[in-house]
Amino acid sequence: MTQTENLTAAAPPAASPVRVAIAGATGYAGQELVRLLARHPHARLTMATGSQATSAPRKLPALARIFDGEVVPLDLKAVGQAADVVFLALPEAASADVAPVLLAAGARIIDLSGAFRLRDHAARAKWYPATKALPAGVVYGLTEFAAAEIAGASLVSCPGCYPTASLLALQPLARAGLLRRDADVIVDAKSGVSGAGKAPSERTHFCENHGSVAAYGLFGHRHTPEIAQALDCDVTFTPHLVPLDRGILSTIYARLAPGTSAAQVGEAMETAHAQSPFVRLTGDALPEIKHVAWSNFCDIGWRVDEASGRIIMVSAIDNLLKGAAGQAVQNFNLLIGADERTGLL
């Protein structure tokens, strides 16, 4: 049975649309959330806010006729009263403060920041010092590997964009025991400039970025411990900024367990993603960013060198959709009992 043939539909959600709000609706990921949720058949977008209580009210011209409401200042009491599910597209320090308040008000949370991704206290203190503790009921929301947990979660912590592209490729092999303990995993990733956020900087300035490719965050990127946490092994991760508006291409190198064949790798990937509607396994046909841009798909290809026991994998996603807003809506669908494809195809 092929990957596509094996997909099954989820139970239908409740008849009434779920009230949703977005905090941080003016950033790149936030605006994608507005676009997706304003047209979602099982969601009623009741409020979209800025990232601060002092944010000036504003419209979103790019979303005219899709969402003609106003993005208002962040008022936690009003958000808690207006929504049953709240999407947080805020900086991690703001999410760390806001989420407990909204949880106490009875809302379920889907958080796009890194505030609640790391389980280890020491790692969290190093990379996300604003997060003092993980709220009860938090689930790491890599959709393809946590569907049951997400359905019952009070807080879904969506993975980062780079970890999403990396783990959808590597986790099937790790779970099948096909990676060596000392797998020497290397992730070499290229991202469009929207991954750096909307705040202007020299690094994302047109004159600096256009016609160039630059590495950054060597041995110092907060997505490294997130990838390593899921794989339970050391990871070397190097991101690069490329002159594209959106998209991530990750080239991944690893050592396979002794005796692992190319056929075993293919079987592990097919088995792991048989029920993954947004993962497209391309095998020898290597993915490209242009094939996934403006979609919620993750394309994964690979080559195995059985003689050396090494594998090279290539994965591609749209960083703002599968790496952020699209994955968040996919998790929302699971949260409300809808088919996870709803509003994304």
Q: Where in this protein do the model-derived segments appear?
A:
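Generic structural signal for well-ordered, non-membrane alpha-helical segments
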Residues: 26, 95, 162, 166, ...
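Generic secondary-structure signature for well-ordered alpha-helical cores
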Residues: 38-42, 175-179, 221, 229-233, ...
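Conserved glycine-rich beta-strand-loop-beta hairpin in the small C-terminal domain of fold type I
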Residues: 246-250
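Alpha-helical scaffold segments in soluble metabolic enzymes
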Residues: 32, 36, 168-172, 226-230, ...
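C-terminal active-site/capping subdomain that shapes the small-molecule cofactor and substrate pocket
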Residues: 253-345
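N-terminal Rossmann-like NAD(P) cofactor-binding subdomain of oxidoreductases
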Residues: 2-209, 214-216, 303-307, 342-344
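Aromatic-enriched alpha-helical interface/lid elements that frame and gate functional surfaces
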Residues: 242-245, 271
